[in-house]
Structures are given as C-alpha cells and as structure tokens.
C-alpha cells in the first residue's frame, strides 16, 4: 500500500458480511488486511467511533534474498544472498517513512553468528540512515493561510527538535506552514511527524519549494503523515511549504525537519 492508516475497522479480521442492516454492526462489511484502503473516510463511512481501533502498520522484511528475486526466508540458507544497503534504504523510506514500523529480520548462521557479508551490509545500511539525519537544515517557520497571510511561528520552528513533548496544533483558520531557510541550499528530505496522542489526523497535504526565480513548485501531493512521513525533495531552494488540504480536526505536529 502507498498509504498506511493507523485507525482502522475492528471488523477487518472478522468474516465478511453483507451490509443489509442499517444499525446492525455484525453486518458491516469486512475490510481485509490486504485491501488497498484500510482507513480512509470512504472505507470507514459506515463505521462509528466504537467500531474503530488503533492498529499501527508493521512492515516485516528479511535481509536475505534468493538469487532470482528479492524475497528471502526468515532463516539463513547458503543459497541466499543479502539485500544491499540501497535496497534496504528504499524499503526504509517506503515503510518507516510512510507511517509503518520497519522490522528487519537478520538471521544468524547455523553456528549462531552473523556472517561477514551480513555485518557488512548492516554497516552500510546504518551509514545511509545516519547520513539521512546527519545534516539538519535550520529554518524559521511561518504559519497562516492565503486569506489571513503568514506570520512567524516560533512554536513551529521549535519542532525541528524531535521530542515527544513538542506539539503545535494548526488553528482552524490556517492551512499553510512555510519553512524559510537561512540561505539557498539543496534540501534532500522533509520529515514530518504527528503527535499521535491526538490520533492520526492529516489526510492530504502538498509540499512545495520556492524556486530560484521565486515561483512555487509542487514537489509531491501526499496523503498521510502519522508517526513519520519522509518526503523526498532533492531541490535547491530558499523555502519549503507544507499545505494541509484535508484533516480530521486540527493537525497536531510534533516534529518538522529538513535535511
């Protein structure tokens, strides 16, 4: 799935039933785990709040792969190889960077140790993760809307420090957060995290950068944030804009950072 909701139907693991009773919860249609959409408004339209649960996504993957495909077993076999650091990094961006927990299975040999190539691949993967977060870019944050204008917001600037105690609730009359850099430079990634104490709220948002000619360029039309969203930017810019298009009540952010 491209998007992972944490708020899903309780009925998703039950046997399917036809939706014939307006108020009969036992007749609510099952949403199978393999469905493309587990938690959008459309998917949950017939469910009440009592029919929902918090069920975070988990992505399990083995570092091993078979010679002819990328799938490997949970145990060590000599005829299998290890996935490379670039492959593991892409998986990380598409799992941990899209509101899922990334669980990497690393099987030892029959002697109970990790072979040399496994250790090498893990070190290379770890180095790539460190490089992602090793060069934070400072910014001054502004929030507002097209109607009311933009104003400097110290609370949003403070979100660059990733701390569970951080929180900024975007007011009902605001939908834009601008991150103004100290100077023009290349931004590789935008990292966003919601404060999940208040549940998962953001449903759609766009990311823009200001070009060197002063125009706004859309980088990506995104959907969910949740625990973490990593947006690839890869552009030189002086300003990054987050435009919240749709949310379930006011978004609560705990972390906003550029790298």
Residue spans for each PLM region:
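Beta-strand signatures of extracellular beta-sandwich domains
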Residues: 206-208, 257
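A short, structured loop/turn motif at beta-sheet edges
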Residues: 210-212
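Extracellular Ig-like/FN3 beta-sandwich strand-entry sites
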Residues: 237-239
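Edge beta-strands of jelly-roll/beta-sandwich modules across compartments, strongly enriched
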Residues: 248-259
């Amino acid at each position: 799935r491209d998007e992972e909701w944490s708020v899903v139907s309780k009925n998703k693991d039950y046997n399917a039933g036809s939706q014939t009773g307006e108020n009969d919860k036992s007749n609510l249609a099952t949403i199978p785990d393999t469905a493309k959409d587990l938690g959008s408004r459309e998917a949950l339209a017939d469910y009440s709040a009592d029919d929902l649960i918090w069920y975070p996504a988990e992505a399990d993957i083995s570092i091993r792969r078979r010679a002819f495909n990328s799938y490997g077993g949970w145990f060590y076999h000599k005829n299998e190889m290890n996935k490379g650091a670039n492959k593991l990094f892409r998986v990380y961006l598409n799992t941990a960077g899209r509101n899922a927990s990334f669980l990497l299975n690393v099987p030892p040999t029959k002697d109970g140790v990790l072979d040399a190539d496994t250790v090498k691949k893990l070190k290379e993967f770890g180095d790539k993760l460190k490089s992602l977060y090793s060069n934070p870019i400072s910014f001054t944050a502004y929030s507002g809307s097209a109607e009311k204008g933009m104003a400097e917001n110290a609370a949003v600037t403070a979100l660059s420090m990733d701390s569970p105690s951080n929180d900024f609730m975007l007011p009902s009359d605001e939908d834009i957060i601008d991150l103004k850099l100290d100077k023009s430079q290349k931004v590789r990634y935008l990292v966003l995290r919601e404060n999940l104490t208040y549940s998962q709220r953001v449903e759609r948002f766009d990311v823009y950068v200001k070009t060197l000619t002063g125009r706004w360029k859309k980088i990506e039309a995104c959907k969910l944030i949740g625990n973490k969203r990593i947006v690839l930017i890869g552009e030189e810019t002086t300003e990054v804009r987050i435009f919240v298009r749709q949310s379930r009540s006011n978004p609560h952010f705990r972390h906003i950072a550029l790298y």
